[in-house]
Amino acid sequence: MVEPGQDLLLAALSESGISPNDLFDIDGGDAGLATPMPTPSVQQSVPLSALELGLETEAAVPVKQEPETVPTPALLNVRQQPPSTTTFVLNQINHLPPLGSTIVMTKTPPVTTNRQTITLTKFIQTTASTRPSVSAPTVRNAMTSAPSKDQVQLKDLLKNNSLNELMKLKPPANIAQPVATAATDVSNGTVKKESSNKEGARMWINDMKMRSFSPTMKVPVVKEDDEPEEEDEEEMGHAETYAEYMPIKLKIGLRHPDAVVETSSLSSVTPPDVWYKTSISEETIDNGWLSALQLEAITYAAQQHETFLPNGDRAGFLIGDGAGVGKGRTIAGIIYENYLLSRKRALWFSVSNDLKYDAERDLRDIGAKNILVHSLNKFKYGKISSKHNGSVKKGVIFATYSSLIGESQSGGKYKTRLKQLLHWCGDDFDGVIVFDECHKAKNLCPVGSSKPTKTGLAVLELQNKLPKARVVYASATGASEPRNMAYMNRLGIWGEGTPFREFSDFIQAVERRGVGAMEIVAMDMKLRGMYIARQLSFTGVTFKIEEVLLSQSYVKMYNKAVKLWVIARERFQQAADLIDAEQRMKKSMWGQFWSAHQRFFKYLCIASKVKRVVQLAREEIKNGKCVVIGLQSTGEARTLEALEEGGGELNDFVSTAKGVLQSLIEKHFPAPDRKKLYSLLGIDLTAPSNNSSPRDSPCKENKIKKRKGEEITREAKKARKVGGLTGSSSDDSGSESDASDNEESDYESSKNMSSGDDDDFNPFLDESNEDDENDPWLIRKDHKKNKEKKKKKSIDPDSIQSALLASGLGSKRPSFSSTPVISPAPNSTPANSNTNSNSSLITSQDAVERAQQMKKDLLDKLEKLAEDLPPNTLDELIDELGGPENVAEMTGRKGRVVSNDDGSISYESRSELDVPVEILNITEKQRFMDGDKNIAIISEAASSGISLQADRRAKNQRRRVHMTLELPWSADRAIQQFGRTHRSNQVTAPEYVFLISELAGEQRFASIVAKRLESLGALTHGDRRATESRDLSRFNFDNKYGRNALEIVMKSIVNLDSPMVSPPPDYPGEFFKDVRQGLIGVGLINVEDRSGILTLDKDYNNIGKFLNRILGMEVHQQNALFQYFADTLTAVVQNAKKNGRYDMGILDLGSGDEKVRKSDVKKFLTPGYSTSGHVELYTISVERGMSWEEATKIWAELTGPDDGFYLSLQIRNNKKTAILVKEVNPKKKLFLVYRPNTGKQLKLEIYADLKKKYKKVVSDDALMHWLDQYNSSADTCTHAYWRGNCKKASLGLVCEIGLRCRTYYVLCGSVLSVWTKVEGVLASVSGTNVKMQIVRLRTEDGQRIVGLIIPANCVSPLVNLLSTSDQSQQLAVQQKQLWQQHHPQSITNLSNA
């Protein structure tokens, strides 16, 4: 059976980023169109730019099919105005030629015709059966009976954003006039005429096709009558996010020491029955060394490991427990369970070597003292079981992800760590492999054109080579980010015998459907017994938001820094143009530039809070608490550079911010240094030079010589890497990388340009269509071989001299630059270079001199600014809080700057006499836990997995106060950070203090995190919230609404779009003009050199990039811009709600005052890989109105002066609205509103707003209006009630807005196994982008149901599909039962016992 595809036109336009509301831009003049002449096959013209991006056309170019010569039928009613671009695109694309036809493209205006042939090879199928029966204008394409493998979306033909580009153009005057949208009957080629009414078409398209919010939808600014919509703004309540957790099916073990919660969607799904009996000793269970919920995870993991996937691999298990629940002990328990069953070898992978000690502690704590843990990086290359490796035959091998790709230079049979491990395990290995914190293994599912890293490939290979291994994945963000699941192939969600053939199919399906889809996946996994996810409740935790006011002098300094960066950006651009830098060098240079830009301003933001943190920390210590301060980065690299420059001497704390900019200018400013050039060409210039500048102090010279070789190879390597990926993970280096396991916490090494979430820049995201030999990722692979060859290649000095002379550089003795280390023009020596490629380095002497001068000027300006720049935050904090003897530092840096007793400043190593560097953090942690030090400073990279809670087993049981200087703008990551101090088995819960400045939306980040903490049970200190509770804090930015709002903001600033909201009223000056200038300064708006036209950066709607970049704008500007963005986001969300397209994640029905009844249920068997699952389709009716009797009961209990019945001032359709209001917050004058048709409203109203629209009346006056609306809302929608008619109803569609009683169809159970069927039906009936809305119900008789809402018009096709699947599945079950009778010993049989 060919699966129904999607509607061609809508799939193409919506997925190419065109608003569905814009599609039907048909003017009244379009209505009277003639019936086309009865020609056998009339072919409409197709614009070239809609098919091929490569040809840049100023105007859309018609395409004609050959050899067809029949002219387009004339129109009776020709419009006077040229059609809008959208109408034009709509009509053109609606008549694409059939599959396989050859199109010849012709440009009409010029005399000479340029021809280009293109063949359409793929087309989308639509089936007649899925058409709605209502006579309404539909948009359908000619159907072709293409085989299913050819079903692709038209966006594959429309490369990149060609349609978007087309939308910006005005259609040429001589384009083909639009014709009525027609559906062609394939059987006889005749064309049926259909009505073309603008309003109807728009209504139809909105309802039937695009029930979701298109990512780039332009929301009209026109405000409709807001009364009816407002009533229905939030139709269903949000589910409370978390529910108390207790194991349901397993009754062994003691209660967990702390309260644990689970997301509400997961809590309403029950896991499978337990049939596995654990072998763990009763002593361990009775003593509570493993709690009930840890034993539950161990049991389900062991049970899941007894089943096999359809491809023959053993099934895996995913532990999604949050920070602090005790994942470590659970994993230790799984290893112990298998050890007791004679599976005595196990592999445990994690992110840091320090966690090995935790692994040993966990095994010891559960009574498994005899299981030894060995570090992989301590083994020599060779057999692990051999004598020189201590004959290790059993136990746990602990390794980091980066050590997994370690490789020995000496060769031999086991020269890679992976081969060592595979040999140690053996082919039939059926022991445990644990991937702990598996979301941290870098870049397993790469974005754009990049390749997966070696780590990712090694992890996959390990699983593929050991198919019988018992795999356990552990990750707190397990199933919240689908891309993190890239190598969880043992879950059996994709691959053979599942709805998704490849991981990429799974990702596409899930990401297209939004938040809801991932919830469905998680619920399905729990239902099948392969996933468990609990989180520590934050009950008892308190938090406060501490605002740090910026002083005038600080704002002044910040604005000066902004101006310097704007100048720097211009100079970099000018110098690159001067020396005619090639494209790839520029790409690398800008990558470094923006990366440094982001770090510079992050350092400035953090530095503004140091004084306040010190003050707060001292107060808390006096109050008998202890303090943990969280930092993201340490700035160590800057300190080392300053140290080297000063020849090992320092006279003050190093300014990290200054170091960032100085390093950028010195290393990456595009001014070729001839000294460096000579070195690269192999000319020995070690002889001392008279020209060396005062900067090159004698004590530095040796260091420079010593490092010259490294420097050159490093710079040359950078050049090859193109993106200057200095911090990209050591995964790609291909050499032994155990040394890098310490996870340097400095921003450069952990974050700088690695492919993580914080990327401000990825040079490969623009997917330039370079050939493979130019692919920098491939070049990097071959880099080592090339380097070896290069070393041996000698260079003829004469040829160099002649080349230098020819370019005007060789005539004089080379004058050395004032800066010792400057990157050569990157990529000047690509892997396949020949001597000609050096010419890109050698530019005219004049240009080089000017570029050098610019560089010197920039460095001088920086020196002036440096006087005001703040010092390194970490060093300053430690110094202010009493020095290293009072502060436990847990970071990845090797040394620090301290102030001595005599006031001098010096650099000292962090290592101590009796403590090796590798266990320094562990030692510092112990000092803190023992109470020797009461302040701990942790950096994010070094702290993963470190426990600092007020543990019952620790000496230091003071209450922890956790202060964060830098909040991540994702609530999930913030919760991860707080997991350091809030963990199981604590005496007291911690307090959190968020320090926020008034810079770019830090308040908003804080309120998002605060909202999440509240939903987890935390309390605020009093009522001092930085943001009012009615604020948008519950909306995260980084979602489709945020991206859409940002797109509208950016387009309105460059006048591509009209603004949705007015700019902040209190902004002094011309908002749009100033902000435009500011955004040009931070590179989010580009100015075309010749024309001066403004264009948006390619990633202009990337929220992360936007929030990072606007820090580089002046303080008042960035705040005004952020306010404007937040206001636009509010408007976008409100519009989405009004259009019924707001994706609220999971919705709750039946938790409030609604009455939920189950009226029907259909059950279907589905194909499941381990057990035969089933899905149920429930028909649910929900009554949510409020009768007059109920209203008067509430009214009788009201006491407030403003409580009572109100009537609307406005009369519509001879009717007034009656409402009942009750004051809930006298201080803020917030009121709860009840309505006759929709009952209690979620949104609280401000009294001032109520007074504008309503007046207070006595109950008798409200009675008639209340009853009138209550009775009519049983079957009349709001539109019909208030306006007398409903557009939807007049088209024969069902409108449920404002109805008192509504019907929902909910699909529950193993939805994942019928995903493709559901997708197919939703797509064919309701368009490609319909959102998957998850709902949680509690019926009147107490039954809980969680599932997917199926739109009414999809129910009957879905039932037909599931019925056929059900019959075939029943047959399969009977065959399976027969087979099991003949094979009673099978594992599968056992698993179903």
Swiss-Prot record:
One of its GO terms (biological process) is positive regulation of neural precursor cell proliferation. Residues 781-793 have a biased composition (Basic residues). One of its GO terms (cellular component) is nucleus. GO terms for molecular function: chromatin DNA binding; histone binding. Residues 697-716 have a biased composition (Basic and acidic residues). Pfam families: AAA_34, Helicase_C_4, SBNO. The modification N6-acetyllysine is found at K149, K413, K1222. Keywords: Acetylation, Coiled coil, Inflammatory response, Nucleus, Phosphoprotein, Wnt signaling pathway. It is found in: Nucleus. Residues 733-747, 756-775 have a biased composition (Acidic residues). Residues 824-840 have a biased composition (Low complexity). Residues 843-870 form a coiled coil. Residues 129-148, 687-840 are annotated as: Disordered. The modification Phosphoserine is found at S148, S162, S214, S692, S693, S697, S754, S755, S768, S794, S815, S1386. It comes from the Eukaryota. PANTHER family: PROTEIN STRAWBERRY NOTCH HOMOLOG 1, STRAWBERRY NOTCH-RELATED. Plays a crucial role in the regulation of neural stem cells (NSCs) proliferation. Enhances the phosphorylation of GSK3B through the PI3K-Akt signaling pathway, thereby upregulating the Wnt/beta-catenin signaling pathway and promoting the proliferation of NSCs. Improves ischemic stroke recovery while inhibiting neuroinflammation through small extracellular vesicles (sEVs)-mediated mechanism. Enhances the secretion of sEVs from NSCs, which in turn inhibit both the MAPK and NF-kappaB pathways in microglia. Belongs to the SBNO family. This is Protein strawberry notch homolog 1. The lineage of its organism: Eukaryota, Metazoa, Chordata, Craniata, Vertebrata. The gene is SBNO1.
